[in-house]
Amino acid sequence: MKENDVVLRTVTKLVVFILLTFGFYVFFAGHNNPGGGFIGGLIFSSAFILMFLAFNVEEVLESLPIDFRILMIIGALVSSITAIMPTFFGKPFLSQYETTLTLPILGHIHVTTITLFELGILFSVVGVIVTVMLSLSGGRS
């Protein structure tokens, strides 16, 4: 890339914000509507890859406190533990638990264990996609 890609870098800052916002929306809407951890992870990955394309890969990696290989492992562990945990309580594998919390400012919040499982999927997808793309590009994986 040329050093004076002002338009690309400016547009990237806006588009990355939009992608990350949309990724959060898709992730949290996933247990009631289409979406979830996998699609949210792909959207988050595309935001990271766009940053790598617009800016120097090493600078982006230095500014992000994320090791994508560790993120991949953490995601797999979170999903596995969430899936296996119900068997210790005599329930079937991948059983879902839900409750409603009442918080002073936020009001009633519907909390499910599937959200934690989907978060693990999101972490795994982001970790795998970004690690593969960095490896293919010759950057630090």
Swiss-Prot record:
| Listed transmembrane segments | 10-30, 35-55, 70-90, 114-134
Which GO MF terms does the UniProt record name?
Answer: antiporter activity
Q: Which GO terms describe its cellular component?
A: plasma membrane
GO terms for biological process?
monoatomic ion transport
Give the location in the cell. Cell membrane
Lipid bilayer topology = Multi-pass membrane protein
UniProt-listed InterPro entries: CPA3_antiporter_subunitB, MnhB
Keywords in alphabetical order, please: Antiport, Cell membrane, Ion transport, Membrane, Transmembrane, Transmembrane helix, Transport
Q: Note the subunit structure.
A: May form a heterooligomeric complex that consists of seven subunits: mnhA2, mnhB2, mnhC2, mnhD2, mnhE2, mnhF2 and mnhG2.
The similarity annotation says:
Belongs to the CPA3 antiporters (TC 2.A.63) subunit B family.
Q: Which NCBIfam families did the record assign?
A: PRK12573.1, PRK12574.1
Quote the PANTHER family the UniProt record gives.
NA(+)/H(+) ANTIPORTER SUBUNIT B (PTHR33932), NA(+)_H(+) ANTIPORTER SUBUNIT B (PTHR33932:SF4)
Report what the protein is called.
Putative antiporter subunit mnhB2
Native species = Staphylococcus aureus (strain MRSA252)
Q: Which gene encodes it?
A: mnhB2
